[in-house]
Amino acid sequence: MQRNRIAKSVLAALAVIAMSAGSISARADGAPRANGFWWPETLDLSPLRQHDVESNPYGKDFDYAQAFQKLDIEAVKKDIRTTLTTSQDWWPADYGNYGPFFIRMAWHGAGTYRTYDGRGGAGGAQQRFEPLNSWPDNANLDKARRLLWPIKKKYGQNISWGDLMVLTGNVALESMGFQTFGFGGGREDDWQSDLVYWGAGPKFMSNNRDKNGKLEKPLAATQMGLIYVNPEGPNGNPDPVAAAQDIREAFGRMAMNDEETLALIAGGHTFGKAHGAASPDKCVGVAPAGAGVEAQGLGWANKCGTGKGVDTITSGLEGAWSVDPVHFTMQYLDNLLGHDWVLTKSPAGAHQWMPKDAQSIVPDAHDPSKLHPLMMFTTDIALKVDPAYSKIAKRFEEHPDEFKLAFAKAWFKLTHRDLGPKARYLGKDVPKVDLIWQDPLPVAGYQTIGAADIADLKSRILASGLPKSELIKTAWASAASFRGTDYRGGANGARIRLAPENGWAVNDPASVAKVLKSLEAIQSGFNKGRTDGKQVSLADLIVLGGSAAVEDAARKAGYDITVPFAPGRVDATQAQTDVASFAVLEPTADGFRNYYQKGNERSPAELLVDRASKLDLTVPEMTVLVGGLRALDANTGHSKLGVLTNHPGTLSNEFFVNLLDMSTEWKKSPSADGTYEGRDRKTGALRWTASPVDLVFGSSSELRAVAEVYASDDAHEKFVRDFVAAWTKVMNLDRFDLKRI
């Protein structure tokens, strides 16, 4: 499965890319304009067409997991270690070691992850593509990836760029004396830029906060083009107190608590140096996206001095945090807490800090005859002046082993957060311990049910008296919590019965509780007293109940079809479920169930596409699922919006037939906001009510084209079979075990 993400709009994404290349209106003669240019309200379906298999040069049958298993990872590590200390004239290594440079590369590749929508992160290696490859915060990382190209070239398809960059960061840390927590492979590469909403700012370094100072969801970085926060302070203002607030919010939205945040900053700034030999405005050229073809994808050409080595310009800040920047030491914390720091400026004019009693004790990165004072960023000083961070920093300084473990675990979390559950990890270096942020699942201590058991359980479920629509709603609620951006959620674990999911309004908690109570009774009756070692999980029963109800609805439509079912799910415990971490998965809108909370900044139709994108659905799959779920009466709150059938509970194509019926005229309801009334054109009699999500399948030209297929007289069976296929896909989205068989 390819990671699927969504843009706020295609134009927003294009605008970001254009920041490096010039105005979006500057275009070659004859270049086409997107429909959104002329009609901004046009529903953008491009997120459902991202990362299709046709874009992958390895082809649809390529299995990265199998390719990775053939990799001699120790040989790769050896090659990385050699590269670390083999300085290249075209981009010399600071202190003769590229380790700190590669740590920054890995950190910035993974550090785009954000919890609210699961987008960003190391997976896909999006740092290679616009806009990330041209963000100000990623300046000169184009050279880091070029330094790694010989290794990528050598091992080819057996290691992705995403895995190689993270592994290189690990090896860099280890080569400089730090013990990492482990490494898991499995990051498949993307082959095109993501359409991700990174902020509304019209230019890089724009403030991502609104006029009230609130950081917009789902963003995490405080300024456009930064991974986290501005190292000089908010908007370049060297205020450590305000910087601490920015750090806490930005890192928190990237899944890090205070201890993890401090460990990451202190650990990362133990190594390397910042580069600000001269003014970027006077010396540095355009980012890679704006450079000419002769630059071959490289940017930030520096015309001052040699343009590299001692003359390197990256952030504009200049100097190192310790006197030994290529070995792991406790010097960062010792220096931060042991000195009084005063504000100064770098040679490039950037705000930074130096000891009040500054002495030239730091070796130059390229000239051993020179020494420099220590330096700190405003964001470093923030860790000293903020009471909570300062307390942690002092504890870490006094207990180095505690700091080492905290940094190791935080680094592992940073670089693996978007990889999903541990079942997706590859390789021999995967830590054996389960971590709560991995959404751990228990190991089944029983045999999985077989075909005869499945048939028996279906009969028991259908004979239980549970409403079929409630079985379908519960199964959908459980499985559709999945999001393909960071592979979280889904039916496996049956977390729909646990906090916080058991209280989500979109799921109709009271109705779900009744279904679960009945299913638990069936589970107990099946499992009790068995001598054959077989057991059924509630997670399997939830999905099986929905599938049995779908089969029943298909029979009512005249089609005897079996919904594919793969047993093997297990039941998680509350102790294995981090309530705060799972809370961000709660939908504020789900067009598949005609659910939409007030306060959303985006339209119901846009959020339907967003939800479909997270479920890794295509346009036809999204379309058939909406039509089928309406026919099955599966709306939240038993709403009749969009139930365009006189036979609810029958898996028919009537939603599409009646939506496209020209004898019905649609108008906004005069009494209910967000509701439309479909009336007989001749008599004015009310036939149906619908939401904007329902009507978009008739108003959007692209969706209407698909809806017409399913509304056709010859499409009854196709509709049923396509619905079952899409339903099964959603039920199995988190079954990573099935994809490895």
UniProtKB/Swiss-Prot annotation:
| Cofactor(s) it depends on | heme b
Name the Gene Ontology biological process terms: cellular response to hydrogen peroxide; hydrogen peroxide catabolic process
Highest taxon of the lineage: Bacteria
Which keywords does this chain's UniProt record carry?
Heme, Hydrogen peroxide, Iron, Metal-binding, Oxidoreductase, Peroxidase, Signal
Q: What class of enzyme is it?
A: oxidoreductase
Catalytic reactions of this protein: H2O2 + AH2 = A + 2 H2O; 2 H2O2 = O2 + 2 H2O
Tell me if Metal-binding is a UniProt keyword of this record.
yes
* EC number in record: 1.11.1.21
Mind telling me which PROSITE patterns this protein's record contains? Answer: PEROXIDASE_1, PEROXIDASE_2, PEROXIDASE_4
Q: Which Pfam families match?
A: peroxidase
Q: Name one GO molecular function term.
A: heme binding
Cofactor binding mode and count: Binds 1 heme b (iron(II)-protoporphyrin IX) group per dimer.
Residues that bind heme b = 269
Could you tell me which HAMAP family the record lists for this protein? Catal_peroxid
**NCBIfam families (alphabetical):** cat_per_HPI, PRK15061.1
State the function annotated in the UniProt record: Bifunctional enzyme with both catalase and broad-spectrum peroxidase activity.
The UniProt similarity line reads:
Belongs to the peroxidase family. Peroxidase/catalase subfamily.
This chain belongs to the protein called: Catalase-peroxidase 2
